[in-house]
Amino acid sequence: MVCLEQALHTQHCKTDIPPLLLSEDQTNQYLEEIPLWNFSSAEKSISRLFSFKNYLETIAFINAAAWIAQQENHHPEIKFGYNKCTVLYTTHSAKGLTLFDFICAAKTDQLVINE
């Protein structure tokens, strides 16, 4: 079920029920809510490259993203360098994208909303 009445970043991953694989139509609807994220049909994932002024800002962002992941119990793949960081979400247990990926992506976007 696509719940677009409530902003993605205000929703939570419900750990008491297994995440449901999204249809192509649902995926496309959610992608509209996080336009800076890239969809990979091959990897069945969404990812975004974040850029920062320096290493310290990059690490601070990673720590904040890790905190979100821990709170939601949904953990991304994070790759980083001096002033760049790529965050990738997919749901391994569902073998593709679920609402959890989009909730966490939207919450991660909130970390840099004023940039």
Locations of the language-model features?
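Charge-rich alpha-helical segments
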Residues: 1-115
